[in-house]
From Swiss-Prot:
Pseudogene resulting from a nucleotide deletion that introduces a premature stop codon at position 66. This is the C-terminal fragment. The intact protein (AC A0A140NCB4) hydrolyzes deaminated glutathione (dGSH, 2-oxoglutaramate) to alpha-ketoglutarate (alpha-KG) and cysteinylglycine, has less activity against alpha-ketoglutaramate (a-KGM) and no activity on glutathione or L-glutamine. May function as a metabolite repair enzyme. Residues 1-163 form the CN hydrolase domain. It comes from the Bacteria. Belongs to the carbon-nitrogen hydrolase superfamily. NIT1/NIT2 family. Transmembrane segments: none annotated. This is Putative protein YbeM. Disulfide bonds: none annotated. It holds the Pfam family CN_hydrolase.
Length: 187
């Protein structure tokens, strides 16, 4: 069964919206996620017109693997990725309109690899292309290795992702089991 994940702006209150990630399976909405971390950085203030969400999306089941949802600026906050990994996520999906700017491409690639390593999850990141955004969609394996990538132009990228690879990496690099403490809300 095909799973489609997309982002839209959904009205919240008059003149405002949620930056919403929606997951569809067989034409039905199976998950909604209102972006937690609004992009109020690099001279942009998303919070002027967008309301922050307040819940982590439930994990999805896709082809026998558990998938966590994040979007864009959420990438800079490792707690969200970690919380989903601790719930059992094996893949983290992140659509993003990553705005161009000094060192932004470096931030994108570094943070994607870091989140894969922090969580020992695959990262599937769809980067919006265009004049303002960097594109650079990527699939990164749980060891932080890019296994598929696109440039700044629209492209279809594919890679094999398997639960066996997640188990193999987690056996070699058991960071989720080796954690000694965390704030209570992340347990």
């Amino acid at each position: 069964m095909m799973t489609t994940i997309l982002t839209i702006h959904v009205p919240s209150t008059p003149g405002r919206a949620w930056n919403m990630l929606v997951a569809l399976q067989a034409g039905n909405i199976v998950a909604r996620y209102a972006k937690l971390h609004l992009y109020d950085a690099f001279a942009i203030q998303e919070s002027r017109r967008v309301d922050a969400g307040n819940e982590i999306a439930p994990l999805l089941e896709v082809e026998g693997m558990k998938v966590g949802l994040m979007t864009c600026y959420d990438l800079r906050f490792p707690e969200l990725a970690l919380a989903q990994a601790l719930q059992g996520a094996e893949i983290l999906v992140l659509p993003a309109a990553w705005v161009r700017g000094p060192l932004k491409e470096h931030h994108w690639s570094t943070l994607l690899a870091a989140r894969a390593l922090d969580t020992t999850c695959y990262m599937v990141a769809a980067g919006e292309c265009g004049n303002k955004n960097i594109g650079q969609s990527r699939i990164i394996d749980p060891f932080g290795v890019t296994i598929a990538a696109a440039s700044e132009m629209p492209a279809l990228i594919m890679a094999e992702v398997t639960p066996e690879r997640v188990r193999q990496v987690r056996a070699q690099l058991p960071v989720l089991n080796n954690r000694r403490f965390a704030p209570p809300q992340l347990l």
